[in-house]
Amino acid sequence: MSLRVACIGTGTVGSAFAVVFARAGHDVALFDAAPGAVETFALKRIRATLDLLETEGALAEPVEAIMSRIRPAASLADAVKGADYVQESVAEEVAVKRAVFAALGEAAPAGAILASSTSALAGSRFLDAAARPERCLVAHPVNPPSLIPLVEICPAPFTAAETVARARELLAAAGMSPVTLAREIDGFILNRLQYTLVAEALHLVGEGYCT
């Protein structure tokens, strides 16, 4: 089933999510607060990613067919108009995310899932800025999600169970491999495991076991 998806913030993560959703057959609207960011950078990055996937035989249809489902939006409100799912990928600053989710809460349809790509911030620090915060959660990907399917779904204490279930279903149908956290923890699971591995690697180098 084709859905309407909005990607808010179109840097590396936001652009990669656009690839994920458009490749899955969804209509994707892109918005970035930086003037010209979508046209100058995001669309080019998206096309380059799709070209790579096509070269590797990883696309089921031509690049142009997928690109035809992606459009730049004139505003945040334009991007989320009629959206079923919104993926936020803006700066990792609580104040910025609170402002964005407040705007999303006002502009997005009441039934839309509002998800954040935050890589470290607990969702409860900013998701409650949105109206009806029970439809909000964190969907933290491995970067870039267009190539690595793992995504951590982390509900805030106020996130509805139905929201988690719908997000899991939507992301899985888009080709991702969602795992769900039982409750919040700073850095989520993946980052904490990665940091532990890096710390041990540095310890081994420091002790002279390897270089």
Please give the residue ranges for each predicted region.
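Rossmann-fold dinucleotide-binding core
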Residues: 113-192
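Amphipathic alpha-helical segments within well-ordered protein domains
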Residues: 51, 151-154, 199-203
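Rossmann-like NAD(P)-binding element
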Residues: 33, 37, 52-113, 121
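Active-site-lining helix/loop region of Rossmann-like oxidoreductase modules
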Residues: 188, 195-211
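Hydrophobic/aromatic beta-strand patches that form the interior of the parallel beta-sheet core
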Residues: 29, 73, 87, 137-139, ...
